[in-house]
């Protein structure tokens, strides 16, 4: 895996507007891809999440959500530092778990990454939307936008359709 700074990615500041994530890119405040996708969720998906929250209770649902967010952030930090050739030593429980999960991605996914154009890249379509992705480059011979996802268990294909749209 080699670096090729083929593109200059814009800098951006993330901000909340009406409690929705937006990116300040140049002179534009653009809604995030995640914000747009959450606004287009099916009623079925929203109801499934609401049903799960009722089943486990609001306190447990919030705990699961926060743990997943913390774990995902730690995983992304570890992978970002790895890709940049920097080390990250986080001896907290979350950090140790993130390192374990990151090593799976490093061993099984990153060997097929041939070229890196950017890490933590802001991408946008002027006037419409913006987002940040973990990597841009050549993966398995194809130009690729790569976004790492954290999960404690395998996901069924029908549950991750938004990942592909993202």
Where in the sequence are the language-model features?
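Metal-dependent nuclease catalytic cores that hydrolyze phosphodiester bonds in DNA/RNA
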Residues: 1-130
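Mg2+/Mn2+-dependent nuclease catalytic core
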Residues: 114-166
